[in-house]
From Swiss-Prot:
UniProt entry keywords in alphabetical sequence: Cell cycle, Cell division
UniProt GO BP: cell division; regulation of division septum assembly
Classification via InterPro entries: MinE, MinE_sf
Keyword set includes Cell division: yes
Organism the protein comes from: Mesorhizobium japonicum (strain LMG 29417 / CECT 9101 / MAFF 303099) (Mesorhizobium loti (strain MAFF 303099))
HAMAP family hit by this protein: MinE
Protein name: Cell division topological specificity factor
Functional summary from the UniProt entry: Prevents the cell division inhibition by proteins MinC and MinD at internal division sites while permitting inhibition at polar sites. This ensures cell division at the proper site by restricting the formation of a division septum at the midpoint of the long axis of the cell.
Signal peptide boundaries: none
One Pfam family from the record: MinE
Family: Belongs to the MinE family.
């Protein structure tokens, strides 16, 4: 049962990102002629990741394979290990 106060709770970013991706993929299925959907997805995915991890844009690859009945979205992200990222020294 849904509580009225649940409508005002802040949702975590993962479910929100997943919901946005599902909406975009559903839209893409209806409008297959839109060529730059992959670039839109890439920008939105990069924005979500940048909120949590600092990565170079060159390390994010997004591709879409469009089939007759199904489209496949492939996302390749190289995230540096925490030990490889230099820490700022507090002064």
């Amino acid at each position: 049962m849904m509580n009225v106060f649940d409508l005002f709770k802040r949702r975590s970013s993962a479910p929100v990102a997943r919901e946005r991706l599902q909406v975009l993929l559903a839209y893409e299925r209806r409008n297959r002629s839109q060529p730059d959907l992959v670039s839109i997805l890439r920008e939105e995915i990069m924005a979500v990741i940048a909120k949590h991890v600092q990565i170079d844009q060159d390390y994010l690859q997004v591709s879409m394979d469009r089939g007759e009945t199904m489209s496949t979205l492939e996302i390749d992200i190289q995230i540096p290990n925490k030990s490889a990222v230099p820490m700022a020294i507090a002064g």
